[in-house]
Amino acid sequence: CAAYAAGDPTHWPMTDAPKPLPFQVIGVGVVFNAQDELLIDQRLEEGLLGGLWEFPGGKLEEGETIETCIARELQEELGIAVTVGAELITVDHAYSHKKLRFVVHLCTWVSGDPQPLASQQVRWVRPEELKNFPFPAANARIIEALLGSLG
């Protein structure tokens, strides 16, 4: 074989060093209304994690604060205005093709009727109802922190 002929059979086959995974910061809003219900949305069927439920949010843009990101994403994707409050938790999660950091803040709904502008549907639910909806694995720690904060 070529490696033996070259005098170094342990050097072959040569592989490139693994490339670092892309990293993104995601701002997430856990939005409460006046009835202490939470807003969740269902991801579109096509694409990664299709059909699962999630807390709304999106990618942090360059030069943007996480609070601004959350407010912007909820306006763009759901058509609502919120007041972004305290940070609840930060969750790092790795997929096979990228690493994500979810920075999660508690939010208060201010105005706008939530619309599924970038999802299948949106729903207000009681915290104890969250267990009835399938969420991505990365959301388990968010739900745990949320329920723990509610006592």
Regions found by a protein language model. Name each.
Residues 106-146:
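NUDIX/MutT-family hydrolases
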Residues 54, 99, 123-124:
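Short aromatic/basic micro-patch
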Residues 30, 40, 102-106, 124:
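Conserved hydrophobic/aromatic beta-strand scaffold that supports enzyme active sites
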Residues 8-38:
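Conserved N-terminal beta-strand and adjoining loop/helix that marks the start
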Residues 1-8:
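Amphipathic alpha-helical
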Residues 25-27, 71, 75-113:
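Active-site segment of metal-dependent pyrophosphate-handling enzymes
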Residues 33, 37-81:
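Conserved Nudix-box catalytic region and its N-terminal flanking loop in Nudix hydrolases
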Residues 147-151:
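Generic C-terminal helix-cap and adjacent flexible tail
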